[in-house]
């Protein structure tokens, strides 16, 4: 069966139900839900204009149905490390980019994997820049705050992050 724009076989299986068309959005939604992101998908998909910065496996972390930019797009290897060289610089970038959410894929950050980025996320939470933390199967979605958050709330959020986020395990790799 011919299944691609190049008229080659084998890329996508044809199903008569959809007359040969492939619903890539449904496929990505199923793949993301398999990784434990059902409610996170639903939240960010409420508005296709939502802007998300994703700390996750590239390019799969870009598949949410909104405006997603990976952390790698912003910093090394493809971006400008000056944008994230301090929490203040990253906050400035998020304000400039009108970022709504930050997403952290379960098992992506931790000792041996993007440690500096993990410390940056912790600092953003401690400073109150990320609020309304939501966890699903070790994945995290946090709202970027444009208002000052009380120190006690920020500390509670940081403790919740340490407890609920599923960190990268180098020994399991």
Describe these PLM feature segments.
Residues 32-35, 54-58, 104-108:
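Structural motif
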Residues 2-42, 59:
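Membrane-proximal, lumen/periplasm-facing interface regions of secretory-pathway glyco-
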Residues 100-173:
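Aromatic/acidic, Gly/Pro-rich catalytic loop(s) in extracytoplasmic/lumenal soluble domains
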Residues 1-5, 64-67:
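Short aromatic-enriched loop/helix-cap "lid" or pocket-rim segments at secondary-structure transitions
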Residues 16-19, 45-47, 53-96, 111-128:
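Extracytoplasmic
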Residues 51-52, 101:
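Beta-sheet entry/capping signal
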Residues 26-28, 90, 120-121, 161:
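Generic structural signal of hydrophobic/aromatic residues within well-ordered alpha-helices
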């Amino acid at each position: 069966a011919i299944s691609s724009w190049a008229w080659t076989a084998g890329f996508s299986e044809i199903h008569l139900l959809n007359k040969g068309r492939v619903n890539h959005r449904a496929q990505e939604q199923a793949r993301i839900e398999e990784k434990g992101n059902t409610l996170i998908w639903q939240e960010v998909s409420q508005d296709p204009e939502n802007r998300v910065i994703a700390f996750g496996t590239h390019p799969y972390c870009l598949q949410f149905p909104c405006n997603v930019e990976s952390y790698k797009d912003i910093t090394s290897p493809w971006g400008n490390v000056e944008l994230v060289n301090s929490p203040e610089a990253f906050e400035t970038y998020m304000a400039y980019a009108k970022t709504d959410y930050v997403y952290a894929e379960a098992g992506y950050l931790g000792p041996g994997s993007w440690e500096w980025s993990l410390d940056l996320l912790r600092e953003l939470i401690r400073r109150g820049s990320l609020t309304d933390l939501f966890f699903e199967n070790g994945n995290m979605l946090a709202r970027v705050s444009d208002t000052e958050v009380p120190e006690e709330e920020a500390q509670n959020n940081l403790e919740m992050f340490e407890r609920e986020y599923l960190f990268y395990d180098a020994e399991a790799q």
